[in-house]
Regions:
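Acidic-basic catalytic patches of nuclease active cores, encompassing PD-(D/E)XK
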Residues: 1-37
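Short, glycine/acidic-enriched loop or turn micro-motifs at the edges of active sites
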Residues: 39-41, 63
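Mg2+/Mn2+-dependent nuclease catalytic core
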Residues: 64-87, 93
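Conserved catalytic cores of phosphodiester-cleaving nucleases, focusing on short active-site segments
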Residues: 27, 48-67, 84
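Conserved protein-kinase catalytic-loop segment immediately C-terminal to the catalytic Asp
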Residues: 47-50, 107-109
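Domain-level recognition of nuclease-like catalytic cores that cleave nucleotide substrates
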Residues: 94-130
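Short acidic/glycine-enriched loop/turn segments that link adjacent beta-strands
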Residues: 41-44, 114
């Protein structure tokens, strides 16, 4: 099945992997430890879970080809945010001691299959479910 972009699932997954790899590298260079990639529970997935200085960052990665009609940032709408928060809550149930959490968004722009630009938004949204 193809979306309106005309890009098939395999191509989207490949682009997504390139974006996630780039963000993991970015996080590692900034002192984060990658705890988990593609954490999935019923109803949701978190692309990257990383930790630094006792803060767990739940990172949503959106990858787009250069010149796409919609930005990667626009794709993380309130519905997507709610799914991410619920998935993060499921992840945190397995942690015995309280932790500080935040929700970050990484927007990766590709050109010819290579990372052209990476924008990282710390604390891009919160768990308040407005």
């Amino acid at each position: 099945m193809q979306r309106k972009t005309g890009i098939d699932h395999t191509q989207r997954r490949k682009a997504g992997n390139i974006g996630e790899d780039a963000v993991c590298g970015f996080l590692a260079r900034h002192g984060y430890e990658i705890i988990k990639r593609n954490f999935t529970v019923r109803g949701g997935e978190i692309d990257i879970i990383a930790e630094k200085a006792d803060i767990i960052a739940f990172v949503e990665v959106k990858t787009r080809e250069h010149g796409s009609l919609t930005s990667a940032e626009e794709a993380v709408d309130p519905v997507k945010q709610r799914h991410i928060v619920q998935t993060a809550q499921a992840f945190c149930k397995g942690i015995l001691e309280p932790v500080c959490c935040r929700f970050d968004v990484a927007a990766v722009e590709l050109e010819n299959g290579r990372v052209k630009k990476l924008r990282y938004y710390v604390n891009a949204f919160d768990a308040s479910m407005k």
